[in-house]
């Protein structure tokens, strides 16, 4: 597949300056036995200085200054993920990205690593609970009730959050097949949930956390929505539609389409989310709050659309108080909109942390050719198509595992989470009881994920086959548009 990065290529293509996007590169290599690459150079965009509260848990961070951050060599081994010395309740705003995660990525701050993992596990719940059995009464719905979802999916500390609403999305897809099949394709399906932190967890988190999680692409109509690669105005604000702010039409359709013609009259994904978030914000309006949106693959696109929607409508603004932070944790997410979408998100204070794998082709889509890297010629001349280029939003935390070549594994959410937690220290104490064999770390990691992905492959082979058949029914024009 032409879009997949060749693992035998040098890493140089990934080290080019991605300005104006802030890029933070974390070297990571898995091989048998483990081999570590030479230190790579990092380049970060300007951002505000980080809080001094986080100083005790940041190791080897560069000295802050008013001048642009210098180019420096990353350490050969990532930072240790040992216990943090500052409680989350004191620094949660920094962890949520108030300073664009400055000095928290390289080396990776233990608290940030912990929170990314926690939100990633909340997203994985959507996959574990999604019913794909056509013979089940809960087909395309969640297997469990809201009260038992987190416990049934064996999430750590399920009592920390209370699920308040399930979210459904309706793909607006019509292709040249039978009317009955088209009706099934337009059927709403469960894509995630809204949850609020419990009273007991508020003390540890430092605020009331409203969380929305989205799963990635699973069903055939969702695959087709991903291939509707054309930019269209979002038009979220009723009085100021901002026609220059454009997003990918397939993601927008999934976010805004409803099932109003059915006997149930289900609202769109957007209406469900805005209504529930507004209700929760009104319920906890006297408390310190945060809005955290997390998603994998297609779900990260929905999370970014929701974040922009909330901020554009001003739902997170409070009179006489500071704005409620809106943060997106994106796992393996594609590009969502154009340059104006990125600029507007930054103006509104939407924070996005993108966790990506350099070998994951999904993170290169859409806009394989025309994107933020080919918008300006020679660093000076704006190209005519720059307004139509897809652009990533936010700060990028890159996991580099070139030796993982399984196409299923490189995009798998659990692989992302596992790799994020396979951090190694610069040095290990001689007296440490953890005398593990370093040559077996990568072997165990690949073995575990390989067995898991082979099981999933056998379980879902029918769905992949159907997806391929449907994709081949697309016109050559649509396929051409997706490449660009």
Curated annotation (Swiss-Prot):
Transit peptide: 1-63
The enzyme's E.C. designation: 3.1.1.-
Reaction equations catalysed: a 1,2-diacyl-3-O-[alpha-D-galactosyl-(1->6)-beta-D-galactosyl]-sn-glycerol + H2O = acyl-3-O-[alpha-D-galactosyl-(1->6)-beta-D-galactosyl]-sn-glycerol + a fatty acid + H(+); a 1,2-diacyl-3-O-(beta-D-galactosyl)-sn-glycerol + H2O = an acyl-3-O-(beta-D-galactosyl)-sn-glycerol + a fatty acid + H(+)
Active site, renumbered: 297, 360, 411
Distribution of this protein across tissues and organs: Ubiquitous. Highest expression in flowers and leaves.
Disruption outcome: No visible phenotype under standard growth phenotype.
Keywords for the protein's UniProt record, in alphabetical order: Chloroplast, Hydrolase, Lipid degradation, Lipid metabolism, Plastid, Transit peptide
Main location: plastid
InterPro entries: AB_hydrolase_fold, Fungal_lipase-type
Pfam families for the chain: Lipase_3 (PF01764)
Recorded superkingdom: Eukaryota
GO cellular component: chloroplast stroma; plastoglobule
CDD domains referenced in this protein's UniProt entry, alphabetically: Lipase_3
Gene Ontology process terms (BP): leaf senescence; thylakoid membrane organization; triglyceride catabolic process
Induction text: Induced by wounding. Not induced by wounding.
GO molecular function terms attached to this record: galactolipase activity; phospholipase A1 activity; triacylglycerol lipase activity
Compartments in which it is found: Plastid, Chloroplast, Plastoglobule
Sequence motif: GXSXG, positions: 295-299
Entry similarity comment: Belongs to the AB hydrolase superfamily. Lipase family.
Functional summary from the UniProt entry: Acylhydrolase that catalyzes the hydrolysis of phosphatidylcholine at the sn-1 position. Has a strong galactolipase activity toward monogalactosyldiacylglycerol (MGDG) and digalactosyldiacylglycerol (DGDG). Low triacylglycerol (TAG) lipase activity. Plays a role in plant growth and in leaf senescence.
Protein's UniProt name: Phospholipase A1-Ialpha2, chloroplastic
């Amino acid at each position: 597949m032409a879009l997949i990065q060749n693992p035998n290529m040098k890493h140089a293509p990934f080290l080019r300056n991605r300005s104006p996007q802030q890029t933070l590169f974390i070297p990571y290599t898995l091989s048998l036995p483990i081999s570590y690459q030479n230190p790579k150079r990092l380049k970060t965009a300007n951002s505000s200085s980080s809080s001094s509260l986080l100083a005790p848990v940041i190791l080897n961070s560069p000295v802050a200054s008013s001048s642009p951050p210098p180019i420096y060599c990353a350490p050969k081994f990532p930072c240790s993920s040992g216990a943090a010395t500052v409680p989350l309740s004191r620094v949660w705003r920094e962890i949520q990205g108030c300073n664009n995660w400055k000095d928290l990525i390289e080396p990776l701050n233990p608290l940030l690593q912990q929170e990314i993992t926690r939100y990633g596990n909340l997203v994985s719940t959507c996959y574990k609970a999604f019913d794909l059995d056509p013979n089940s009464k809960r087909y395309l719905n969640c297997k469990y009730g809201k009260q038992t979802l987190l416990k049934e999916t064996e999430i750590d500390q399920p009592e920390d959050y209370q699920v308040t609403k399930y979210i459904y999305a309706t793909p607006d897809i019509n292709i040249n097949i039978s009317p009955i099949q088209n009706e099934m394709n337009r059927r709403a399906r469960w894509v995630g949930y809204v949850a609020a932190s419990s009273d007991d967890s508020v003390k540890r988190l430092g605020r009331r956390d409203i969380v929305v999680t989205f799963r990635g692409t699973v069903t055939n109509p969702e695959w087709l929505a991903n291939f509707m690669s054309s930019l269209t105005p979002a038009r979220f604000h009723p009085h100021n539609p901002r026609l220059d702010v454009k997003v990918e039409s397939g993601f927008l359709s999934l976010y805004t389409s409803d099932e109003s013609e059915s006997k149930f009259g289900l609202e769109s994904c957007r209406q469900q989310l805005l209504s529930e978030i507004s209700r929760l914000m009104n319920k906890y309006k006297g408390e310190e709050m945060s809005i955290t949106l997390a998603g994998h693959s297609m779900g990260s696109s929905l999370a970014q659309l929701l974040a922009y929607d909330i901020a554009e409508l001003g739902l997170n603004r409070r009179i006489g108080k500071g704005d409620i932070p809106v943060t997106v944790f994106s796992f393996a997410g594609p590009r969502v909109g154009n340059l104006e979408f990125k600029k507007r998100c930054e103006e509104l204070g939407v924070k996005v942390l993108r966790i990506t794998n350099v070998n994951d082709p999904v993170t290169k889509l859409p806009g394989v050719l025309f994107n933020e890297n080919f918008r300006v010629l020679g660093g000076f001349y704006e190209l005519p198509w720059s307004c139509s280029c897809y652009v990533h939003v936010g700060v990028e935390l890159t996991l580099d595992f070139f030796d993982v070549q399984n196409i299923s594994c490189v995009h798998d959410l659990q692989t992302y989470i596992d790799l994020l937690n396979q951090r190694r220290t610069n040095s290990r104490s001689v007296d440490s009881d953890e005398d593990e064999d370093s040559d077996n770390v990568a072997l165990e990691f690949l073995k575990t994920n390989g067995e898991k992905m082979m099981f999933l492959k056998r379980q879902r082979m029918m769905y992949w086959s159907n997806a391929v058949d449907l994709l081949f029914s697309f016109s050559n024009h649509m396929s051409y548009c997706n490449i660009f």
